[in-house]
């Protein structure tokens, strides 16, 4: 076996400046390929502070050990892992992309005129790769072991619960290999329907369990209010929304082994933030807005369908586009002005009347 210790030089990575690429040096890549050609059982030990690209050489080597930035006992730890005295159980704290162009900030960095726009917003790390369905080299939360683990019998303490009560996820984990080891169980939360744009799933809990060969243990991971909450810029606070969520239990962000559906009841009573510039879709999605505007919208819908020939899809076929999507995405005042001919009062008076009614319900 050949062991290659590959560390990024200071001109490639250091504090005080940003990396220009994800690559090892050309000399390091050439060394890996030459050694691996002569000795297929080559192990590459990486000493780096952030992900590196490996597509040029990873298929040529037998294994890669990510050592990150080690302390003075790092050498002993590496030896223990390579010689099997310790079973590795670490999981990646970030995604390893296939190439630089796949990364979330690629189009915005290094910026222009001395300014960088952080345009990725919430979609950083695995959240971005999940949403874009971008293939990666190694996903967030990934890590190998000298043994294997099976997940089964995932349960929750309650299938329906209030946000202030939270919920506890339990899953049975079995060591199906021949060596003692530790597994890090990860729980991701997927919101089936949100009032704001959210990533497909987010890590909200994890736990490490140590198992002997053939042993099974039940792992419990509690999820509290914040596990289901998101920051709402209009309300200027963390909020929850009532609805259905999927609790995804897995060994990494892409290796989901079990899933449980739950229903959350939000206990928050938020002030109404609807105004004339809120879209019809926002009015109908708001609990107070739906009460006030729902009957008016139903009347508008019936009159419009009749005007365009009736039927469930009459408007779409008559004017050749999804009329309702267009209408629902219009601000209240603009939509009422557009529909003025079918209204019983001036659109501005109706908008003011609706606003008065909706805020009286708070």
Report the location of each language-model feature.
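C-terminal non-catalytic regions of proteins with extracellular/luminal or membrane-system context
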Residues: 1-362
């Amino acid at each position: 076996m050949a062991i290659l210790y590959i560390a990024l030089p200071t001109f490639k990575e250091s504090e005080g400046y940003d990396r220009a690429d994800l690559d090892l040096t050309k000399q390091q890549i050439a060394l890996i390929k030459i050694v691996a050609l002569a000795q297929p059982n080559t192990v590459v030990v990486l000493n780096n502070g952030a992900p590196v690209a490996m597509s040029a050489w990873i298929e040529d080597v037998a294994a890669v050990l990510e050592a990150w930035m080690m302390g003075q006992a790092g050498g002993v730890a590496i030896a223990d892992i390579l010689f099997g005295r310790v079973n590795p159980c670490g999981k990646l704290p970030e995604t390893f992309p296939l190439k630089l162009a796949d990364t979330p900030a690629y189009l915005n960095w290094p910026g222009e005129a001395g300014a960088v726009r952080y345009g990725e917003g919430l979609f950083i790390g695995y959240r971005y790769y999940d949403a874009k369905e971008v293939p990666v080299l190694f996903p967030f939360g990934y890590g190998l072991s000298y043994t294997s683990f099976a997940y089964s019998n995932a349960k929750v303490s309650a299938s329906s619960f209030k946000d202030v009560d939270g919920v506890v996820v339990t899953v049975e984990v079995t060591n199906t290999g021949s060596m003692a080891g530790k597994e890090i169980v990860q729980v991701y939360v997927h919101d089936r329907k949100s009032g704001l744009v959210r990533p497909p799933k987010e890590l909200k809990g994890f736990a490490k369990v140590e198992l002997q060969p053939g042993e099974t243990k039940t792992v419990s991971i509690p999820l509290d209010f914040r596990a289901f909450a998101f920051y709402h810029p209009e309300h200027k606070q963390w909020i929850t929304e009532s609805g259905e969520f999927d609790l995804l239990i897995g060994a990494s962000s892409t290796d989901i082994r079990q899933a449980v559906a739950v229903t959350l009841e939000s206990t928050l009573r938020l002030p109404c933030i609807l105004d004339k510039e809120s879209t019809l879709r926002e009015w109908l999605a708001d609990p107070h807005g739906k009460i006030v505007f729902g009957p008016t919208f139903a009347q508008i819908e019936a009159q419009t369908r009749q005007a365009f020939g009736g039927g469930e899809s009459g408007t779409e076929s008559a004017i050749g586009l999804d009329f309702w999507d267009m209408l629902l995405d219009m601000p209240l005042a603009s939509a009422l002005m557009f529909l003025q001919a079918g209204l019983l009062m001036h659109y501005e008076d109706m908008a003011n009347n609706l606003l008065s009614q909706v805020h009286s319900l708070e």
